[in-house]
UniProtKB/Swiss-Prot annotation:
SMART domains: RINGv (SM00744). The RING-CH-type zinc finger domain is required for E3 ligase activity. Keywords: Endocytosis, Endoplasmic reticulum, Endosome, Lysosome, Membrane, Metal-binding, Transferase, Transmembrane, Transmembrane helix, Ubl conjugation pathway, Zinc, Zinc-finger. It is a multi-pass membrane protein. It comes from Xenopus laevis (African clawed frog). This is E3 ubiquitin-protein ligase MARCHF2. Zn(2+) 2 binds at C80, C82, C106, C109. It is an enzyme of class 2 (transferase). GO terms for biological process: endocytosis; protein ubiquitination. The gene is marchf2. A zinc finger (RING-CH-type) spans 56-116.
């Protein structure tokens, strides 16, 4: 997962104004003030969030390094060894980050998180707007299975019935041919069913492995301590920047 930052000044152009929604949000904003824009994307290129803020309205306290919001709506955590403005994060933002990147460690300080991964049900896989060819293949195979299964059963029954009739009239060659045809028919049907079932099971297993629900496990005592240190670090950084400006 990556974050891209840019500063929008009046009359300036940059590469983050590609989508129509993004342009609309910029047009509706106050163009007389510079804006701070952050886009958070996963490794597969999927846009997770876009944050647009005026530079003059940034919070003085600690903010989430993913969504760049303060701790008013949700408590900020410091689950890793990162300090300063990169040391605090929302629990839900970090869980979404870890789920999208399919990792369990901080990509900056490489601290391992204590997480619990829960697999998602099959219904979410069917509703997932992923690759459409996989869903089309699944739909076609289900239709073929519903059509071929009764057809194979009826054909096998007719072949066995014909072989029985030929045996009664001492036509052993025709009876053996019908029995061989029945065996070949059911062999092809079983092989096709097993191959199709295995293919879709592999697709579901891969999706289930990379789309798990991540729950971050952090003790309350550690949360309180790390939040205090992160807040002090942000205050020191702000104080140092004020002295530099003066």
């Amino acid at each position: 997962m990556t974050t891209g930052d840019c500063c929008h000044l009046p009359g300036s152009l940059c590469d983050c104004t590609d989508s129509a929604t993004f342009l609309k949000s910029l047009e509706e904003s106050d163009l007389g003030r510079p804006q701070y824009v952050t886009q958070v994307t996963a490794k597969d290129g999927q846009l997770l969030s876009t944050v647009i803020k005026a530079l003059g309205t940034q919070s003085d306290g600690p903010i989430c390094r993913i969504c760049h919001e303060g701790g008013n709506g949700e408590r900020l955590l410091s689950p890793c060894d990162c300090t300063g403005t990169l040391g605090t994060v929302h629990k839900t933002c970090l869980e979404k980050w870890l789920s999208s990147s399919n990792t369990s460690y901080c990509e900056l300080c490489h601290t391992e998180f204590a997480v619990e991964r829960r697999p998602r049900p099959v219904t979410e896989w069917l509703k997932d707007p992923g690759p459409r060819h996989e869903k089309r293949t699944l739909f076609c195979d289900m239709v073929c299975f519903l059509f071929i299964t009764p057809l194979a059963a009826i054909s096998g029954w007719l072949c066995l019935r014909g072989a029985q009739d030929h045996l009664q009239f001492n036509s052993r060659l025709e009876a053996v041919g019908l029995i061989a045809l029945t065996i070949a028919l059911f062999t092809i049907y079983v092989l096709w069913t097993l191959v199709s079932f295995r293919y879709h099971c592999q697709l579901y297993s891969e999706w289930r492995r990379t789309n798990q629900k991540v729950l971050l496990l952090i003790p309350d005592s550690k949360t309180a301590t790390t939040i205090h240190h992160s807040f002090l670090s942000s205050k020191l950084l702000k104080f140092a920047s004020d002295e530099t400006t003066v």
